[in-house]
Amino acid sequence: MATVVTFLVVIVGWIFSLCLHEFSHALVAYYGGDTSVRDKGYLTFNPLKYTHPVYSILLPMIFLLLGGIGLPGGAVYIETWRLRSKRWESAVSLAGPAANLVLAVVLAIVLHFAPVSASGVWPGLAFLGLLQIMAMVLNLVPLPPFDGYRVVAPFLNPEVRGRIDQASNIIMLVVFFLLWYVQVVNNIFWSVVEWIAVQLGIPLSLAVMGLTQFQFWRR
């Protein structure tokens, strides 16, 4: 029963966090001048409005189910030419990872004051908090197609930016390959994630328990 509860908590919570991530992009874009996000339904918090069949569903679920890694995967199309400045464009990109951090902090506070136990809810929430940190760290990588790149991209030479954007898909595959198969890169990634989790007060032992219960098919 605990396994089922954990699985549902993580899946539902992860979908909510994807919506929050993309909603945050859209909200900042709206205040930055791109009112088209309202017409596109991005301010409704409707999961269907943020859906891309590959980036929103397929890749995130594969990474989550096979590797327990929180891959951010929404799809909000911002009309950047409407934004008031390059700084607003950077702020829009930062809004998503910031939302993941805020949710991680909220979950850490809940876990701190709640009667934490090994039942399905609490390990699920702890693992969900860890997923938020993973998503934030991964999304801040300053390479396309991650938000970290979108933060600095407005200030790049247009020709340089164009060439980098053309190689976006290849760069993404290289990043995932390094993260998955190169031990040094994997260790650095997890060290950063764990350090942030400890600073926020997310119990790592409970999060690991949540991961184990979530991936029940590996037992």
Regions found by a protein language model. Give the residues of each.
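Hydrophobic transmembrane alpha-helices and their immediate loop junctions
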Residues: 1-219
